[in-house]
């Protein structure tokens, strides 16, 4: 299946689920292919025919963007290694959930969450430990008796009941048959895999936000009072944020390639619900391209602080909407 067909199918699924979907990111390199929003749920979607094609650098940027913009990274594909992705199964690549189009459809359109996760060694299911313990006690079955029936240790049953261990599909089916009770816990794709925040990582990320960017223009924006998250693979060069506003930030001379990026940034910013700004090195022919505000470098040099820049951006955006 060609990637373009895959992306087209994904857009259809997301739109059917009520998502607003951005234009496809067709500029290389790209850390994500689509942005999509439904209410408070913002997705950064990476599409790869083989999900093993995701590399660590791209995954890191996806996760940084998602965290910075209160969204979720998600990987959608068709195969892994030499086999097709199983439906109703969630795979993980660099802590990003990966799934098939059918699983995407079931989750967002049919509201049917998957039950199975892929891990080294096979496919596993999370057991609702409280339900398991209650069901076992209701039939007056000891840990030892249930363990013997399953062919596992008493300690394993205890771990199932304490929620400390997932089980194979066969074990869960056998358990449900013995106890006549549904025990599998569904997977909230967007939230089940959120990691507990490591204080060291939080401190490191906070330090990065306080460190001036290497790019001269981004550094200038930083000195005005913005936190600036630089990107290497997104259609924009950074995301700039202060206490009252957030804007996707591009930096370039005025050119046809810049105009193309500005159109794409407009589409993405509309989905993300931020402003989109391009800082132009040299002269600009226009004040905006679609919904992306264009500001010449010389104009930026006259700005005193973030309030002044916010005012300029909002006034120029308002003028565009009135025209």
UniProtKB/Swiss-Prot annotation:
Pfam family of the protein (one): HTH_3
Domain HTH cro/C1-type intervals: 132-190
InterPro entries in UniProt: Arc_TR_HTH (IPR020886), Cro/C1-type_HTH (IPR001387), Lambda_DNA-bd_dom_sf (IPR010982)
A molecular function (GO) term: DNA-binding transcription factor activity
DNA-binding residues: 143-162
Keyword NADP on entry: no
SUPFAM superfamilies referenced in this protein's UniProt entry, alphabetically: lambda repressor-like DNA-binding domains
Keywords: DNA-binding, Transcription, Transcription regulation
Name under which the protein is recorded: Putative HTH-type transcriptional regulatory protein Mbur_1811
Source organism (scientific name): Methanococcoides burtonii (strain DSM 6242 / NBRC 107633 / OCM 468 / ACE-M)
């Amino acid at each position: 299946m060609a990637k373009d067909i895959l992306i087209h199918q994904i857009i259809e699924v997301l739109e059917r689920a009520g998502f607003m979907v951005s234009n496809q990111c067709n500029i290389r390199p790209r850390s994500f292919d689509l942005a999509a929003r439904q209410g408070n749920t913002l997705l950064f979607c990476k599409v790869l025919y083989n999900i093993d094609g995701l590399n660590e650098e791209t995954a890191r940027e996806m996760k940084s963007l998602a965290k910075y913009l209160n969204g979720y990274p998600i990987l959608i594909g068709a195969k892994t290694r030499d086999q097709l992705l199983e439906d109703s199964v969630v795979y993980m690549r660099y802590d990003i959930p990966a799934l098939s189009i059918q699983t995407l459809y079931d989750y967002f359109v049919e509201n049917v969450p998957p039950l199975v996760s892929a891990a080294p060694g096979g496919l596993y299911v999370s057991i609702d430990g409280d339900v398991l313990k209650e069901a076992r006690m209701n039939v007056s079955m000891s840990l030892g008796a249930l363990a013997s029936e399953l062919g596992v240790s008493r300690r394993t049953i205890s771990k199932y009941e304490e929620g400390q261990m997932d089980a194979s599909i066969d074990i869960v089916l056998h358990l449900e048959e013995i106890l006549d009770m549904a025990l599998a816990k569904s997977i909230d794709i967007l939230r089940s895999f959120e990691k507990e925040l490591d204080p060291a990582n939080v401190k490191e990320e906070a330090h990065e936000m306080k460190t001036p960017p290497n790019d001269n223009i981004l550094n200038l924006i930083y000195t005005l009072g913005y936190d600036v998250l630089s990107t290497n693979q997104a259609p924009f060069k950074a995301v700039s944020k202060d206490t009252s506003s957030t804007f996707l930030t591009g930096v370039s001379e005025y050119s046809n390639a810049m105009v193309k990026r500005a159109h794409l940034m407009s589409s993405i910013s509309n989905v993300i619900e931020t402003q989109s700004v391009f800082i132009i090195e040299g002269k600009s022919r226009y004040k905006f391209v679609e919904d992306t505000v264009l500001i010449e470098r010389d104009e930026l040099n006259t700005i005193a602080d973030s309030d002044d820049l916010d005012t300029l951006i909002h006034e120029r955006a308002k003028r565009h909407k009135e025209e």
